Amino acid sequence: MIDPNLLRNNLEEVAEKLKVKRNFVLDVALLSELEEQRKSLQVKTESLQAERNARSKNIGQAKARGEDISALLNEVEHMGIELSTTKAHLDEVLAEINQIVLAIPNLPADEVPLGKDESENLEVFRWGTPKTFDFDVKDHVSLGEGLKGLDFAAGVKLSGSRFVVMKGQIAKLHRALSQFMLDLHTEQHGYTETYVPYLVNHATLYGTGQLPKFGEDLFHTNALEGEQPYALIPTAEVPVTNLVRDEILDEADLPLKMTAHTPCFRSEAGSYGRDTRGLIRMHQFDKVELVQIVAPETSMQVLEELTGQAEKVLQLLELPYRKVLLCTGDMGFGSCKTYDLEVWLPAQNTYREISSCSNMWDFQARRMQARCRSKTDKKTRLVHTLNGSGLAVGRTLVAILENYQNADGTITVPSVLRPYMGGLAQIG
């Protein structure tokens, strides 16, 4: 969430920025009214507490003098009832304010280009040259089915649309990709491999910003009465980032760099009719995630570093891609600055997103109460959190099938993956 002090001290300015940069309309009148109620109730609560404490002290003194204290006891009792009622009202107002604040997106960094949607994103550069084929290229679905490695019909039978069964050498290639990515990030980029639960509680989802706004995008468990509800993770960012929730970290230990390979589960609400063919938009897909927890003054520099580490995967796989700086209208809810990496897909004759790398500033840290402290300063401050795909495994598989296809329908295995494939140079 954004800093409540910004809302209290610069509400009109923040509201205007949200409207212009995020197309988000903040109800200024309602929030102002609730803030006035909060301040009034806060003052009344503190006044009642102070008065009750003073009266309680008087009771002790009167009792010591042997005086009748029944009237004083009655006053304190009634004051306690009024205090409880006022506190309850204050809690209600605070909860209402909190619900509003939790729905407010992060403010973009100043350097983020203003724009309404993805058409106004800014291309930073391109890497690699798309291959020219001397035959009609096939898409990954035709290639995978021809090699009997992608079985979408089985996915439908077992689960429904947007699921797949992988088999044989294609399944092995899919596994090889995740192993290659993890090895690269742990051995060369300094990340600690992390294994996390795939089911998380609601506090975890609030921490990284999936709840309350994006509940419909999640797959939720049907909790029995009295049991804690869970949801399947939409990305490893959720459990990995929440490892620092309610923690005070030593600044000397920062940055914390963690990577995890997990399946990701998304309902794809609002995506009806989009990318219905193939692996591009699935309910279940694998991803290798990069997460960094850093000191605030380093986060913009770290965003460049983290994005470069995701780029390295594409470069070693020799897959042409482009780097795009997202405009304000296309950024994620909690991000202050995001780069997308888009890989070239020959069958679509276009670049498609394969990684999104974001600096969340202190947006998630404030929700999680994740703080750090230096040895020279006893005061704590919020950390900054960053995350990025390093990479989406299924989409990387798509890119390899299409970019490394041969005229006879076989697939050349990229050289960096051959050690993970038992030396296999060609599929099919």
From Swiss-Prot:
Catalytic activity: tRNA(Ser) + L-serine + ATP = L-seryl-tRNA(Ser) + AMP + diphosphate + H(+); tRNA(Sec) + L-serine + ATP = L-seryl-tRNA(Sec) + AMP + diphosphate + H(+)
Pathway recorded for this protein: Aminoacyl-tRNA biosynthesis; selenocysteinyl-tRNA(Sec) biosynthesis; L-seryl-tRNA(Sec) from L-serine and tRNA(Sec): step 1/1
Presence of the UniProt keyword Nucleotide-binding in the record: yes
Keyword Lyase found: no
A GO MF term: serine-tRNA ligase activity
PROSITE patterns: AA_TRNA_LIGASE_II
Places the protein is found: Cytoplasm
Primary enzyme class: ligase
Binding residues annotated for ATP, in chain numbering: 266-268, 353-356
InterPro entries: aa-tRNA-synt_IIb (IPR002314), aa-tRNA-synth_II (IPR006195), aa-tRNA-synth_II/BPL/LPL (IPR045864), Ser-tRNA-ligase_type_1 (IPR002317), Ser-tRNA-synth_1_N (IPR015866), SerRS_1_N_sf (IPR042103), SerRS_core (IPR033729), tRNA-bd_arm (IPR010978)
GO annotations of cellular component type: cytoplasm
Positions of L-serine binding: 235-237, 289, 389
UniProt main location, coarse: cytoplasm
Keyword set, alphabetical order: Aminoacyl-tRNA synthetase, ATP-binding, Cytoplasm, Ligase, Nucleotide-binding, Protein biosynthesis
Pfam families: Seryl_tRNA_N, tRNA-synt_2b
Known EC number: 6.1.1.11
Gene Ontology biological process terms, A to Z: selenocysteine biosynthetic process; seryl-tRNA aminoacylation
Gene3D superfamilies: Bira Bifunctional Protein, Domain 2, Serine-tRNA synthetase, tRNA binding domain
Similarity comment text for this entry: Belongs to the class-II aminoacyl-tRNA synthetase family. Type-1 seryl-tRNA synthetase subfamily.
HAMAP family referenced in this protein's UniProt entry, alphabetically: Ser_tRNA_synth_type1
Description of how the protein assembles with itself and partners: Homodimer. The tRNA molecule binds across the dimer.
Function in brief: Catalyzes the attachment of serine to tRNA(Ser). Is also able to aminoacylate tRNA(Sec) with serine, to form the misacylated tRNA L-seryl-tRNA(Sec), which will be further converted into selenocysteinyl-tRNA(Sec).
The record's note on its domains: Consists of two distinct domains, a catalytic core and a N-terminal extension that is involved in tRNA binding.
Name of the protein described by the UniProt record: Serine--tRNA ligase
Organism: Pasteurella multocida (strain Pm70)
Gene name tied to this protein: serS
